[in-house]
């Protein structure tokens, strides 16, 4: 199976971060998460997931103002320099990759060294939706 690493930046995502990690680890080999100053328990949730055995690396960038593009590029370069992988996927904490028919093997056929587009669903909490039914 191809090795995929995801890169995610978070700030105060306690309502979704555990579900995001558990779902994403269905296809990711490792998750790199950049904590941009969480104060709602998100980091503690991630640390408990690491204790459970999830392959997560957390970096801290607690900047009040930041340009996401620059931070993402910083960590893309860092990952490229320190990790062995087949694919690197920047994904937001509210984005759940969702291949057609739930066929995760689609990742095996993606070409390397170029950009690919993968379907995803976005999680938004409101009175009508919950994480259990976003894939309906």
Region roles according to the model:
Residues 2-22, 37:
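Active-site beta-to-alpha loop of glycosyltransferases that engages the nucleotide-sugar donor
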Residues 3, 29-31, 55:
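Residues at the starts of beta-strands that form the adenosine-phosphate
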Residues 25:
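Gly/Ala-rich phosphate-binding loop of Rossmann-like dinucleotide-binding domains
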Residues 29-37, 59-61:
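Short beta-strand/loop segment that forms part of the nucleotide-sugar
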Residues 36, 91-93, 119:
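Active-site acidic Asp-centered loop
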Residues 41-90:
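Active-site-proximal specificity loops/subdomain of glycosyltransferases
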Residues 69-76, 99-136:
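Catalytic-site signature of metal-activated, phosphate-bearing donor transferases
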């Amino acid at each position: 199976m191809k090795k995929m690493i995801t890169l995610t930046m978070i700030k105060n995502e306690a309502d979704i971060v555990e579900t995001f990690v558990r779902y994403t680890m269905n296809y990711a080999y490792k998750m790199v998460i950049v904590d941009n100053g969480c104060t709602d328990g998100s980091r503690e949730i991630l640390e408990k997931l690491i204790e459970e055995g999830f392959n997560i690396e957390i970096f801290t960038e607690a900047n009040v103002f930041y340009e996401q593009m620059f931070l993402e590029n910083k960590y893309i370069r860092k990952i490229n320099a320190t990790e062995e992988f087949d694919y690197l996927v920047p994904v937001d904490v509210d984005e759940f990759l969702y291949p057609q028919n739930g066929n995760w093997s689609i990742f095996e056929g993606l070409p390397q060294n170029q950009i690919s587009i993968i379907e995803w669903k976005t999680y938004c909490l409101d009175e009508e939706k919950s994480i259990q039914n976003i894939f309906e």
